[in-house]
Swiss-Prot record:
Cofactor(s) this protein requires: Mg(2+)
Protein's name according to its UniProt entry: Deoxyuridine 5'-triphosphate nucleotidohydrolase
Residues noted as binding substrate in the record, renumbered to the chain: R69, S70, G71, N82, L86, I87, D88, K96
The keyword Magnesium appears for this protein: yes
Record keyword Magnesium present: yes
Gene Ontology biological-process entries: dUMP biosynthetic process; dUTP catabolic process
Alphabetical list of HAMAP family matching this protein: dUTPase_bact (MF_00116)
InterPro entries named among the record's database cross-references: dUTPase (IPR008181), dUTPase-like (IPR029054), dUTPase-like_sf (IPR036157), dUTPase_trimeric (IPR033704)
Entry keywords, A to Z: Hydrolase, Magnesium, Metal-binding, Nucleotide metabolism
EC number of this enzyme: 3.6.1.23
Function: This enzyme is involved in nucleotide metabolism: it produces dUMP, the immediate precursor of thymidine nucleotides and it decreases the intracellular concentration of dUTP so that uracil cannot be incorporated into DNA.
Length: 150
């Protein structure tokens, strides 16, 4: 399934870094840091990184999800400060990525470095029906760890 997403280039330096799928099977599009200079993230610090891009999905049947790049998280402890970013279909502002250094060493974010990935996903908007009781299920109210171990 393909959809067309409107995109504005807010910083002309990013015109050479339009998000694109790396392979035919790629789910995520890389987002890059639109920085004037390097930023050093100390352990435990967060920094809101601009991308120089804005998107408008327009259709409430879709959202964009921002996720960490696996290599940054595994090798350097760099993840998203909010763990997952959610871009609503009616948002039109600049895409920004909250980076969090959960590692033990300082990490340098370089201008135009790939910092996160964006995945466009379908959304189901649910309506809620108030009930007094649920129809029984085999799980019932079993919560964390209730379905067994490893």
């Amino acid at each position: 399934m393909n959809i067309e997403v409107e995109m504005k280039v807010l910083d002309e330096r990013m015109a050479d870094f339009i998000p694109a799928y790396a392979t035919e099977g790629s789910a995520g599009l890389d987002l890059r840091a639109c920085l004037d200079e390097e930023v050093v993230l100390q352990p435990g610090e967060t920094f809101l990184v601009p991308t120089g891009l804005a998107i408008y999905l327009a259709n409430p049947a879709y959202t964009a999800v921002l996720l960490p790049r696996s290599g940054l998280g595994h090798k350097h402890g760099i993840v998203l400060g909010n763990l997952v970013g959610l871009i609503d279909s009616d948002y039109q502002g600049e895409l920004k990525v909250s980076l969090w250094n959960r590692g033990s060493e300082p990490f340098t974010v370089k201008p135009f470095e790939r910092i996160a990935q964006m995945v466009i996903v379908p959304v189901v908007q649910a309506g809620f029906k108030r009930v007094e009781e649920f129809v029984g299920s085999s799980r019932g109210e079993g919560g964390f760890g209730s379905t067994g171990s490893h």
